[in-house]
Amino acid sequence: MSELNDKLRPLLDDRGLLTDTADIEPYLVEWRKKYHGKSSVVARPKSVQEVKSIVDVCIEERISIVPQGGNTGLCGGAVSESGQLVLSLERLNQIREIDSANNTITVEAGCILVNIQNAAQEARRFFPVSLASEGSCQIGGNLATNAGGINVLRYGNTREQVLGLEAILPNGGLFSDLAGLRKDNTGYDLKQLLIGSEGTLGIITAATLKLY
């Protein structure tokens, strides 16, 4: 992995690439301590371009990527194997826009769920996805797993709250559809293919979500 690290280091700042065992450990263990990852490198991009650059390098080096959000899952979905790179979205955590007229909020994948709820509340709106782990889970993980939560019977799963999505695809391409239209009949609804795919079809980087 040393050659991979050498190629990634110029693309990220000094907090963007973790290789020390002590620094990596929190990204390798899930909450129940039932599964333990084996990766030797964690990349922490802070922009969509950095995510794309990491994916491009991993394609070139034939390295598998394990996207990781808040690492709050209980089934080992974000745990890496030896030789894989953990890509943490925790630094990609900006709220890009709140559109009160359209009742939407556009957020990056690393936004913690409770921060989205609070931002909606400050705008006198409501975001219905609510989970026990909302203080530490990230919206990218909620989308990748199509999380439910306590309001699922009234408002539906997380996929029901999504109007637009942005993601980096396995070939390094950018999928960008953050228009936020509530009625959009233009072709395939590709964002719904990415939601619930747990990172297997792309790395979600941002989403436009419904507010109420």
Q: Model regions: which residues?
A:
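Soluble FAD-dependent oxygen oxidases
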Residues: K38-I65, G141, G149, G173
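Generic beta-strand/beta-sheet core signal
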Residues: D20, Q68, E90, S130, ...
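A short, small-residue-rich loop immediately preceding and capping a beta-strand
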Residues: I65-G70, F126
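N-terminal flexible segment immediately upstream of the FAD-binding catalytic core
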Residues: M1-D56, G73-N103, A132
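A common structural junction motif
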Residues: L12, E60-I63, R124
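FAD-binding subdomain of flavoenzyme oxidoreductases
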Residues: Q94-Y212
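Feature of Fe-S/electron-transfer and energy-metabolism proteins
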Residues: D23-P26, A43-R44, Q49, V57-E60, ...
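Ser/Thr-glycine-rich phosphate-binding loops at phosphate-binding pockets of nucleotides
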Residues: G69-T72, I112
